[in-house]
């Protein structure tokens, strides 16, 4: 059959396309001078999928006995989820409801975010007043109406976004607790109400002299707090409060903790049988998480010395390993056949091996999410400069590094820390999609708390994710050298220990002199007083503690503590502040306990 001009052109076009495709495949081949190839290693094969998470609802938290702290939500579009996250971190049992009658069955009631005739009926507002006169406690954040000013002893002032500092009238002896930060510029502008004190007991003021917190005793207590605590908690825990913080790292920044502890103390004072779930394992004052960022050529080999320090003291630590199999602007290849046995030794020694990405790029926070099908060795991120990278995605950084560490070293990778603490908004859902459960991606000073907390979808205000953040407290890159600021670090940890907090220590094992001595001294100094170990081990403890359900109920004519634990639980204590009683819980997964309180 004769070829027509059209068929000849088509044949030529097909040949050109085939040549282009062949050239593309050739260009995509691994370059052995830049990329280390592990023979026979390909993966991960399964795709990672971002599953949509429905928004958290008030109904999910509308449960529990009347002995809990009640949060009466008068606007469901407010920051109420921030209150839930904060109180759970602090171990305060809460019931969240939109039903005033149900809330008023509790002795201590938070009305959030507003008290006003626009959101509560006259009868409901009178119910709040009667609750106080009957011996209960009511805390209002925005007392905007309803004729309760005389009861609370204050007169509402202007709502502003320019107040940045709150100072307590009674000193704690700790400067960072006596004056806290509550707002700043840009996205972190948190509205506040400056009250005029008429007959209340003033407890705190803003920098403009207006009253920030006050209580008036009328049989019970009527209190106000002029800070939108829910909104502040959401901004801070979502990593959107950087300009509020007084330090980036290596400091004590308890601003959020101080406010939650103040409300906790109102609950303890006003509830006849209050209880608190401990924030630290039984018998310890503080938790110190020992972590190491392995992101430099010599760091892999040096990690053995750090692991030996831990092992000889019966401890475990976390080693966040960069799976650097591409030579680029940052460094030479150091995740290869020579170093994999060193990482396997860490695993054999019981260390927690976590991911520190593939590229370790400052651009991580600006990367696209990716397809969830990124696979080694085709996934080849290339860092051009300090701030730019080619061929990298968030999912690729997470899934490929996790796959390589697990496949080549036998590690079970559940912990993640990004290079340079670069923190994309899509990270929480990407972590879930790729199988992580513990994140250490931001500094404690930025989030204004020294406790772990649960992450939310897109670092937003709606949906909770099953991943907890363990923010960095002490890091080794600021001046002076880490080994020269041992005393300064201990001052910070001592302040955290006063309240049973968590201190996460970040060390780069690029050297083994002053940094290694720092870790040895730290462990020896806190031996006996602190729980010390890996992020994975503490993360599992914290997640089980967070899932624990506790209640005080009437049982056979007397009060009893009921506990139910979906996960295996050890060394969690329940504190009863008024009696001084402490109950330790050790439960199997699905275990329950009923303890008479007398």
Residue ranges and their predicted role:
Residues 538-576:
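Surface beta-strand/loop "capping" patches
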Residues 432-461, 469-479, 532-542:
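His/Asp/Glu-enriched short active-site or ligand-binding loop at hydrolase and phosphoryl-transfer sites
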Residues 147, 287, 300, 311-426, ...:
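Metal-dependent polysaccharide deacetylase catalytic core of the NodB/CE4 family, i.e.
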Residues 66-69, 84-90, 137, 191-274, ...:
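A glycine-centered loop/beta-turn motif at secondary-structure junctions
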Residues 1-17:
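N-terminal Sec-pathway targeting helices
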């Amino acid at each position: 059959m004769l070829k027509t001009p059209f068929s000849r052109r088509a044949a030529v076009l097909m040949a050109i396309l085939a040549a282009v495709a062949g050239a593309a495949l050739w260009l995509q081949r691994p370059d052995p001078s830049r990329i280390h190839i592990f023979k026979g290693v390909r993966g991960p094969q399964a795709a990672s999928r971002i599953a949509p998470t429905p928004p958290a609802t008030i109904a999910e938290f509308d449960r529990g006995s009347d002995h809990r702290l009640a949060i009466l939500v008068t606007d469901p579009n407010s920051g109420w989820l921030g209150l839930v996250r904060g109180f759970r971190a602090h171990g305060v049992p809460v019931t969240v409801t939109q039903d005033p009658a149900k809330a008023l069955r509790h002795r201590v009631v938070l009305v959030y975010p507003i008290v006003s005739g626009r959101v509560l009926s006259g009868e409901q507002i009178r119910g709040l007043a009667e609750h106080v006169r009957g011996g209960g406690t009511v805390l209002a954040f925005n007392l905007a109406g309803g004729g309760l000013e005389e009861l609370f002893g204050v007169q509402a002032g202007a709502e502003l976004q320019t107040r940045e500092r709150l100072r307590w009238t009674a000193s704690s002896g700790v400067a960072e607790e006596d004056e806290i930060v509550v707002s700043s510029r840009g996205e972190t502008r948190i509205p506040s109400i400056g009250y005029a004190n008429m007959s209340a007991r003033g407890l705190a003021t803003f920098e403009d002299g207006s009253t920030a917190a006050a209580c008036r005793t009328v049989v019970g207590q009527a209190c106000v707090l002029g800070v939108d605590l829910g909104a502040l908690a959401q901004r801070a825990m979502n990593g959107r409060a950087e300009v509020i913080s007084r330090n980036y790292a290596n400091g004590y920044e308890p601003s959020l903790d101080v406010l939650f502890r103040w409300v906790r103390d109102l609950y303890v004072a006003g509830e006849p049988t209050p209880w608190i779930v401990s924030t630290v394992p039984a018998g310890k004052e503080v938790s110190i998480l020992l972590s190491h960022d392995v992101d430099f050529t010599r760091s892999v080999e040096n990690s053995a010395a750090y692991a030996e320090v831990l092992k000889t003291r019966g401890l475990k630590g976390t080693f966040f390993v960069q799976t650097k199999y591409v030579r680029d602007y940052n460094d030479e290849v150091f995740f290869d056949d020579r170093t994999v046995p060193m990482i396997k030794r860490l695993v054999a020694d019981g260390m927690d091996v976590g991911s520190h990405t593939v590229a370790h790029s400052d651009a991580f926070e600006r990367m696209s999410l990716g397809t969830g099908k990124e696979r080694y060795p085709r996934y080849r991120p290339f860092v051009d400069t300090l701030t730019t990278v080619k061929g990298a995605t968030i999912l690729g950084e997470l899934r490929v590094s996790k796959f390589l560490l697990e496949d080549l070293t036998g590690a079970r990778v559940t912990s993640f820390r990004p290079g340079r603490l670069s923190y994309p908004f899509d990270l929480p859902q990407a972590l879930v999609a790729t199988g992580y459960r513990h994140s250490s991606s931001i500094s404690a000073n930025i989030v204004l708390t020294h406790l772990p907390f649960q992450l939310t979808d897109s670092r937003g205000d709606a949906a909770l994710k099953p991943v907890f953040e363990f923010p960095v407290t002490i890091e080794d890159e600021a001046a002076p050298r880490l080994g020269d600021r041992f005393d300064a670090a201990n001052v910070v940890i001592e302040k955290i220990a006063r309240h049973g907090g968590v201190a996460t220590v970040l060390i780069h094992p690029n050297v083994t002199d002053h940094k290694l001595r720092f870790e040895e001294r730290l462990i020896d100094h806190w031996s006996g007083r602190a729980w010390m170990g890996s992020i994975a081990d503490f993360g599992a403890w914290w997640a089980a503690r967070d899932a624990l359900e506790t209640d005080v109920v009437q049982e056979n004519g007397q009060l009893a503590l009921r506990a139910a634990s979906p996960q295996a639980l050890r060394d969690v204590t329940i504190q009863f502040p008024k009696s001084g009683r402490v109950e330790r819980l050790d439960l199997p997964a699905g275990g329950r306990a009923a303890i008479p309180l007398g």
